[in-house]
C-alpha cells in the first residue's frame, strides 16, 4: 500500500463509496461489511483500488469544454462527427454560473488541467471571450479550437493579451482553396487564412488542423509547407465513422495510419474528460452518445467506477478503435 494511506473503515461494502479517510476512495468488492486495514494483504474475496487525491488530480490533465452544443455551428463540414450545421437548433449555451460551478469542482480536487474550448463552433457563444478571461485569470493553460471564420483583428488582439493561451487551432483541410472549400464551403479558405494571419501577426501560436481523407490526401504535404510559411504547426485528426462522415460514406486517407501507434497515455480519455450540455463524457468524440455519459459531476466522472467503464469502452467502441489506430 502506498505511503500516506492508513487504516480506514469501509462505511458500506459497495462500489465507489467514500471512506472516512478524505484522502482516498476505496473500491471494494467484498462478501460482507468489515473494517479493512489497507496495509494488510487482501482476502481472496476482496478487490480494492485506492485513489489518492493527487491521483485524482493527475487523472484530469485535460478538460474539454463545449460552450455551445456540439452540433451548433456556422458551417456544415462534410466530415463533421456531430453533423453540425447552421440549420441545427440546440439552445444550449454554457452559462457563467455553470462555468463557476465547474471550476469549483476542479479546484476541489486540486487539479490543474489544460482547458480545451471546442465545438461545434465555440465562437458562436456571445460570452466566450469572457469565459477565456476567467480561465486565464485563474492561471489555467488553455486553447481554442475553431474554424477561424469569426476570428477578426479585434478578437485576435484580445486573445493575444491572454498569457495562458497556448494556441488557437484552426481547421484547414488543404492548401488548395478548391479542395478546402469543397469540404467547408465557398470562400472559407480565404477566411481561415485571414484568421491565421491576424493571430500570427499578434504573436498567438496557431495550429492548422486537418482530417486526412481520400479527397484531400494529395494536398497534405502542401498544407505542411503552408504551415511553415505561416509560422504555424499542423495536427492531423482522425476521421470517425460518425455524423456527416458516416452519412456521406467518407473514408480516411490511404496514407493514414492503420497501425496501433497510440499508447493509453496519449488517448484523450486517459488524459481527462469532456464537459458538454451539463454532463461529463470520456472524450469530445462521444459527447452525443448518452450511453457513454460518466455523470453530472466531476467526482462521478473521475470515480474508479467511471474509469473502469472507460477502459471497457476502449475495447468495444468503434470510435475508440479509431483513436487507438490513429492520431487524436
PLM regions and their residue ranges:
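Conserved alpha-helical substructure of the radical SAM core
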Residues: 42-166
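Short beta->alpha connector loops
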Residues: 14, 122-124, 147-151, 174, ...
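Short alpha-helix
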Residues: 1-4, 193
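Core SAM-dependent methyltransferase catalytic element
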Residues: 12-41
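Radical SAM enzyme [4Fe-4S]-AdoMet core and its adjacent flexible, acidic
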Residues: 17, 29, 89, 166-167, ...
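Cysteine-cluster motifs in flexible loop/terminal segments that predominantly coordinate metals
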Residues: 73-76, 80, 266-269, 275, ...
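Flexible mid-to-C-terminal extensions adjoining Fe-S/redox cofactors in radical SAM and related proteins
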Residues: 17, 39-53, 57-60, 84, ...
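Residue-level detector of anion-binding/catalytic polar loops
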Residues: 6-7, 112, 141, 205, ...
Amino acid at each position: 500500500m502506498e505511503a500516506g494511506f492508513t487504516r480506514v473503515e469501509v462505511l458500506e461494502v459497495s462500489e465507489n463509496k467514500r471512506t472516512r479517510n478524505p484522502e482516498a476512495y476505496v473500491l471494494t468488492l467484498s462478501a460482507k461489511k468489515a473494517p479493512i486495514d489497507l496495509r494488510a494483504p487482501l482476502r481472496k474475496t476482496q478487490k480494492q483500488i485506492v485513489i489518492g487525491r493527487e491521483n485524482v488530480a493527475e487523472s484530469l490533465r485535460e478538460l474539454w469544454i463545449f460552450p455551445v452544443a456540439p452540433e451548433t455551428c456556422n458551417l456544415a463540414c462534410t466530415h463533421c462527427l456531430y453533423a453540425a450545421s447552421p440549420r441545427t437548433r440546440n439552445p444550449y449555451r454554457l452559462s457563467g454560473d455553470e462555468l463557476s460551478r465547474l471550476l469549483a469542482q476542479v479546484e476541489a480536487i486540486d487539479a490543474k488541467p489544460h482547458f480545451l474550448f471546442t465545438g461545434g463552433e465555440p465562437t458562436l457563444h456571445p460570452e466566450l471571450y469572457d469565459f477565456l478571461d476567467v480561465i486565464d485569470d485563474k492561471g489555467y493553460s488553455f486553447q481554442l479550437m475553431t474554424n477561424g471564420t469569426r476570428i477578426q483583428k479585434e478578437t485576435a488582439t484580445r486573445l493575444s493579451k491572454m498569457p495562458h493561451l497556448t494556441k488557437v487551432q484552426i481547421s484547414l483541410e488543404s492548401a488548395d482553396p478548391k479542395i478546402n472549400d469543397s469540404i467547408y464551403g465557398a470562400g472559407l479558405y480565404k477566411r481561415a487564412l485571414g484568421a491565421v494571419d491576424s493571430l500570427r501577426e499578434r504573436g498567438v501560436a496557431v495550429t492548422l488542423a486537418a482530417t486526412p481523407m481520400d479527397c484531400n490526401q494529395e494536398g497534405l504535404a502542401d498544407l505542411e509547407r503552408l504551415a511553415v510559411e505561416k509560422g504555424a504547426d499542423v495536427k492531423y485528426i482522425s476521421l470517425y465513422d460518425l455524423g456527416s462522415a458516416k452519412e456521406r460514406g467518407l473514408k480516411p486517407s490511404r496514407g493514414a495510419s492503420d497501425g496501433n501507434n497510440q499508447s493509453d497515455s496519449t488517448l484523450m480519455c486517459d488524459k481527462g474528460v469532456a464537459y458538454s450540455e451539463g454532463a461529463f463524457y470520456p472524450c469530445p468524440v462521444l459527447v452525443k452518445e448518452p450511453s457513454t455519459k460518466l455523470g453530472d459531476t466531476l467526482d462521478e466522472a473521475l470515480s474508479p467506477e467511471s474509469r473502469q467503464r472507460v477502459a471497457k469502452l476502449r475495447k468495444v467502441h468503434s470510435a475508440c478503435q479509431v483513436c487507438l489506430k490513429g492520431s487524436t
